[in-house]
Amino acid sequence: MSAIKVIGAGLAGAEAAWQIARQGIEVELYEMRPVQMTPAHHTGHFAELVCSNSLKGAGLDNAAGLLKEEMRRLDSLLMRVADQYAVPAGGALAVDREQFSQEITKLLQEHPLIQVHREEVKSLPQAGIAVIATGPLTAEGLAREIQKMTGEDALAFYDAAAPIVTLESINLEKAFWASRYDKGDPDYLNCPMTEEEYKRFYHELLKAETAEVKGFEKGKVFEGCMPVEVMAARGEQTLTFGPLKPVGLIDARTGQRSYAVVQLRKENRAGTLFNLVGFQTHLKWGEQQRVFRLIPGLENAEFVRFGVMHRNTFLNAPKVLKADYSLQKTPQLFFAGQITGVEGYVESTASGLVAGLNAVRRLKNLPTLIFPQETALGALARHLEGSPSVDFQPMSINYGLLPPLEVRIKAKKEKNAKISARALAKLEEFKAAEGLD
């Protein structure tokens, strides 16, 4: 049988390549890094995590946790490696990003059915089956080709990555260990603020200079990765109801709740690096150091990486994609990852998993898989196909995408757990019916 091309070896492309190869089909995997880098990536490794190192909630009362469990049950490579290189993060799944991407790169490069090409692809394949997983930073030449193929203008907004600081530079006499509502282990470092400290920080944040933006469309910002300075501009209390909310965080040393709290999450397994949760930013690097050192406990913080901003380009999925992730008018071409309009690491990986499975089905002239709407995988794909196309915006997985339960349950945690149980039961039924191992 012919090989399937996978263009892009980010989260979605890496997962798609794995799913294709595990079914005995050869893969031609193309990745332009490190020959041609993007504004946001730092390495040539596959599945590099460029924003946070968190893969969101781990529990089955969390939609992202459900999606991850569904992927595990379909032998997701990225979930397997994420579990292998997990770092403590309370109720979330976070990974050592370097070990994570290095292991995925190694496994794919050494796979006997995967041929890796380190080169930029500038045109869409004219024959055969292909998965396009070029991500939010799709190279300009290929982006133009996609526009010609789909007839749709690409949309753009800002994504932002948070700064990382060293543990040894954090003042542990001011910061304290805790997880919100004592959920899970106390894996977060928390920097408490008084009202006076918060207001000083807030006003300096508003005055701080942002870096020059080149080649981006201004003004379109996805809520889930909004720069902290953009959020602050919405009002003085916005941050205290967002990433700096103090609820559920009590400093055991004082027994008091602070006016605001900045949380820091482990960036690596060794626990030597921490990222500032919710502090994606486009401030100039000098300004980041000046303003973020106003946070109690970070007065002498050593920044090993400053926050950066980068472009995100995505399709108007309802107009051009099917729920199997293929193009409506060119069904031999599949798309996966953030370019489809899913948002988030886990969601991108999930789309790659489904696109990879379906690329093989198309090659074998079998009906493609449309996962049940009761599953997170199915709900996400059906959202892309069935949303209104006017002002379509990226979406993360959430329980609102899944059908409600037949019996109303008021307790949110219990309700979500039952939705997850239903989803996993439906997935097992679907796997049995479709012969998925």
Curated annotation (Swiss-Prot):
Residue sites binding FAD per the record: 8-13
The protein's required cofactors: FAD
The protein's Enzyme Commission number: 2.1.1.74
Disulphide connectivity of cysteines: none
One of the GO BP terms on file: tRNA methylation
One GO location term (cellular component): cytosol
Gene3D superfamilies from the UniProt entry: FAD/NAD(P)-binding domain
Principal location listed in the UniProt entry: cytoplasm
NCBIfam families associated with the record: gid_trmFO, PRK05335.1
Family from the record: Belongs to the MnmG family. TrmFO subfamily.
Protein name as catalogued: Methylenetetrahydrofolate--tRNA-(uracil-5-)-methyltransferase TrmFO
Taxonomic lineage of the native organism: Bacteria, Bacillati, Bacillota, Clostridia, Eubacteriales
Chain's gene name: trmFO
